[in-house]
């Protein structure tokens, strides 16, 4: 069945998942539903401690068994130790058929591939998967389905009861013996625990895992003792030095700096750039650079930002230090400067639900003026792909990309015309993660394209000295340089789905075919005749 972005979703997947095809961003606007209530228990006159000796013992007390769903957050990014620690113990206990519901999985979790291959892990729900896990899923090694959700979509799935978490494991930099968790004050600080809040509120059992036990009460708690069943103290939960990795670092690349300048010039010439505007930037190097250049213009023109949202990095936190923004609203910290900034009284932590859940009574993303994002591919319909590489491998994460693009008044995507020798601006993206109706502007190193849906922006920019082109012109330039890319050859088996933030199916991910040389293909064809 064709969905609103023209992707054919097989009936078998619709039946298997019980989901509908994506029918546009506003299909569920005004929809009313009853949230799933969490399971809890009465604790009256307990011994005053929830401490359990180790991971094995807490798994026993939680009643771990085959077929359960366990959850994790990714606030430590590539420095996370908790997922591997817990899953190794589950594996060693001989437990099978586990579903992992993680806010994201990265290269730090490569050891999970062994557990995918032996059936310990059979289903994965995540914002994205990088490294060897993505390769394993794309190669068909996961027995069940990988469901990729946005940050807001994940909260929706948990709160609605679509995803029922049996045990939530929350790595927390500090915790007291009664379960009050904070993202700061320890030796492995990550800043906030926003992605874990929905898990803590809705999981049947909640386990706090810390390497810094502090005296009661550990206030103000990011996650309250009223949600936590058990506390386990381990040697290390993560390496905060690895929070800022890869895309989360500032760039010195001249091409990316040029795109950042184009982006900034577009922002400051748009009708939304005025005193009291709101802003979020992605984690890409060009996006971070655009924030730095924007700060200079804000100072020159005496324009103040009302609030910044994130995923936060040092340049956004510098705006707070320099008193150029009133407040920051934080769901994740991408570097240690952002972690430190959490201590600022005008730096507020918010939950992932407050940030981006489309199935509540209004999330922060709906109040954004600008969001600056990145993409692996953008097609001529402005659809974006941020999850599947041009080789067909799962290699990225939806994150808040679809959420912020849908909510912001002006969603700007920065992408180089070519990713290596592969056109990033193309006729059709490999996989749709963010629909073109959400994307207003695409900034490349060869020019800027405004979505024809946004005639107001086209009119506002008619006298601005920037290299404007149509998206088709950008595609044609890319193809003239590198040629039209050959489509990736996929097998028939569907190994994953790209879920829209509203829970419908945006696209599917198929198993990739092993590479074959042309001569080998010819020989196979001749033998089959």
PLM feature segments, named:
Residues 1-529:
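Conserved alpha/beta enzyme-core scaffold
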């Amino acid at each position: 069945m064709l969905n609103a972005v023209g992707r054919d979703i097989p009936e078998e997947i619709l039946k298997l998942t019980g989901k509908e095809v994506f029918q546009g961003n506003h299909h569920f606007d005004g929809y009313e539903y009853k949230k799933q209530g969490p399971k809890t228990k009465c604790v009256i006159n307990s011994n005053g401690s929830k401490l359990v000796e180790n991971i094995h013992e807490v798994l026993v007390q939680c009643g771990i068994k085959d077929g359960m769903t366990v959850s994790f957050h990714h606030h430590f990014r590539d420095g996370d130790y908790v997922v591997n620690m817990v899953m190794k113990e589950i594996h060693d206990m001989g437990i099978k058929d586990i579903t992992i519901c993680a806010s994201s999985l990265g290269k730090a979790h490569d050891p999970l591939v062994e557990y995918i291959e032996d059936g310990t892990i059979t289903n994965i729900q995540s914002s994205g998967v990088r490294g060897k896990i993505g390769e394993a899923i794309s190669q068909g090694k996961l027995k069940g389905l990988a469901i990729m959700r946005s940050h807001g979509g994940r909260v929706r799935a948990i709160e609605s009861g679509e995803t029922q978490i049996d045990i939530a494991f929350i790595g927390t930099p500090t915790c007291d013996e009664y379960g009050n968790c904070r993202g700061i004050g320890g030796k492995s600080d990550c800043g906030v625990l926003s992605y874990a809040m929905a898990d803590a509120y809705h999981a049947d059992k909640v386990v706090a895992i810390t390497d810094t036990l502090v005296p009661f009460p550990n206030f103000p708690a990011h996650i309250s003792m009223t949600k936590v069943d058990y506390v386990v103290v381990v040697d290390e939960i993560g390496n905060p030095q690895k929070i800022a990795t890869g895309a989360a670092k500032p760039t010195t690349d001249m091409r990316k700096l040029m795109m950042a300048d184009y982006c900034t010039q577009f922002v400051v010439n748009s009708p939304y750039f005025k005193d009291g505007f709101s802003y979020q930037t992605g984690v890409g190097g060009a996006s971070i650079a655009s924030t730095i250049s924007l700060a200079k213009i804000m100072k020159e023109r005496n324009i103040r930002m009302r609030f910044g949202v994130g995923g936060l990095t040092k340049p956004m936190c510098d705006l707070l230090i320099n008193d150029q923004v009133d407040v920051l609203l934080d769901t994740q910290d991408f570097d240690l400067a952002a972690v430190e900034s959490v201590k600022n009284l005008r730096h507020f932590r918010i939950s992932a639900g407050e940030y981006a859940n489309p199935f509540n009574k209004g999330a922060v993303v709906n109040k954004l003026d600008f969001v600056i994002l990145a993409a692996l591919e953008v097609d001529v319909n402005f659809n974006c792909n941020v999850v599947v590489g041009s080789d067909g491998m799962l290699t990225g994460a939806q994150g808040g990309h679809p959420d912020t693009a849908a909510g912001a008044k002006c969603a700007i995507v920065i992408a180089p015309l070519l990713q290596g020798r592969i056109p990033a601006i193309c006729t059709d993206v490999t996989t749709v993660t963010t629909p073109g109706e959400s994307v207003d502007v695409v900034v490349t190193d060869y020019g800027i394209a405004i979505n024809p849906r946004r005639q107001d922006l086209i009119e506002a920019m008619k006298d601005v000295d920037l290299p404007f082109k149509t998206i088709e012109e950008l595609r044609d330039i890319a193809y003239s340089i590198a040629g039209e890319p050959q489509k990736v050859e996929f097998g028939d088996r569907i190994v994953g789905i790209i879920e829209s933030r509203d829970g419908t199916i945006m696209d599917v991910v198929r198993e990739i075919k092993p590479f074959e040389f042309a001569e080998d293909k010819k020989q196979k064809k001749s033998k089959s005749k």
